[in-house]
Amino acid sequence: MRLFQLLFRASPATLLLVLCLQLGANKAQDNTRKIIIHNFDIPKSVRPNDEVTAVLAVQTELKECMVVKTYLISSIPLQGAFNYKYTACLCDDNPKTFYWDFYTNRTVQIAAVVDVIQELGICPDDAAVIPIKNNRFYTTEILKVE
């Protein structure tokens, strides 16, 4: 009986502290989903005029699908398939991989860019979202010609 009397006399701050210790910290903000996860792979070095294959793997952790446009940008002009732009529907259960084959005889810095865009006719039933915070993601690599 005396225990219950002590419990009812406890200050609100003490009760709040006990409640927080029982519930634990809120981890809702620790598990934010990543909009775009990308992995850009090119060789570190090649010989002049060797064919180079650039590979960009893209995925998302969002539950909703997005329309993405992927392309490469270089520090010097490159010709051929390097200039191809790909548009695809990216969903969490369907990652995409894009390939570019090109030639170069000079060292070049290359950026792989992923833009989240609004375009009809790409995702099923045109059901796609556009993130408010970020809609462009990129990574850069240097391709040395030796």
Curated annotation (Swiss-Prot):
The modification Pyrrolidone carboxylic acid is found at Q29. SUPFAM superfamilies: E set domains. GO terms for cellular component: extracellular space; nucleus. It is found in: Secreted. Coiled coil: none annotated. Residues 1-28 form the signal peptide. Keywords: Disulfide bond, Glycoprotein, Pyrrolidone carboxylic acid, Secreted, Signal. InterPro entries: Ig-like_fold, Ig_E-set, PIP. Transmembrane segments: none annotated. Glycans are attached at N105. GO terms for biological process: detection of chemical stimulus involved in sensory perception of bitter taste; negative regulation of T cell apoptotic process; positive regulation of gene expression; proteolysis; regulation of immune system process. Belongs to the PIP family. Its main location: secreted. GO terms for molecular function: aspartic-type endopeptidase activity; identical protein binding; IgG binding. This is Prolactin-inducible protein homolog. Monomer. Interacts with AZGP1. Disulfide bonds join C65-C91, C89-C123. It comes from Pan troglodytes. The lineage of its organism: Eukaryota, Metazoa, Chordata, Craniata, Vertebrata.
